[in-house]
């Protein structure tokens, strides 16, 4: 019989569980909405169209779930903005899909808003290797997140947001717990209510999207919900930091032809001038903001 390639990974994890922890794990899985059985039966027998429609129907529910927790998001965004206005930074920690989403959001802030790369930092359990390939047991280490954060010299001026669909990831719990002890503002974006990650957060966001189309596959609705909240959070914070003028990304980095063209269009709209004049100003001053402000001197 061919040996399951994941046996060596799974076996020590299971054998390392005590009888008590197995019972607690079973109870925890029973109450976690993200692990509940899909409401769709026999999806392996569905047609392609039926599968696509089912996934789409489930996805439609996610924005409504996010809408319900806007008051929670408001509290978190306001607190983060206040810290960052006073010189603090924003850190995300997470494992798997949640960790990758944090890395994506952090990575988008410099090109979109022209901020330094260390203003918003995404850290994934297992390091950057885990962005592309799962790292064994990385999310189960409740000490490693704080070690990872220490590389960036995180301190009481900063903010830490834990990302975990389950709300129970040890890597995230440990990082938030130690951060709170060191006076760091903490928050989270999770998809189950009342979990240990929310308990370690000053400003929890608990967006419950229900069982996944594919049972337990939290990269789907849960991941979508987390991405929506991250979009709302980082965009709101950057607006409050003055990185937007009107409705435009005036500090975006002009790193390719598409973005230079977009920047030129922004200058055209703001100053009501033709494309050639706008392009000349953009080339001369190097940014949309400086090009626009140059005419007001």
Can you say where each PLM-predicted feature lies in the sequence?
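Cofactor-/ligand-binding subdomain signature composed of acidic, glycine-rich
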Residues: 27-65
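Glycine-rich phosphate-binding loops that contact phosphosugars or nucleotide phosphates
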Residues: 91, 95-228, 237-241
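Short terminal hydrophobic/aromatic SLiMs and anchors at protein ends
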Residues: 12-14
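Short, amphipathic alpha-helical interaction segments embedded in low-complexity terminal/linker regions
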Residues: 237-297
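Polybasic, lysine-rich low-complexity intrinsically disordered segments
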Residues: 4, 10, 20-23
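A short, well-structured juxtamembrane/interface segment
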Residues: 68-83
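Gly-rich Lys/Arg/Thr-decorated short loops/hinges at beta-loop-alpha junctions or inter-strand turns
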Residues: 56-62, 122-132, 260
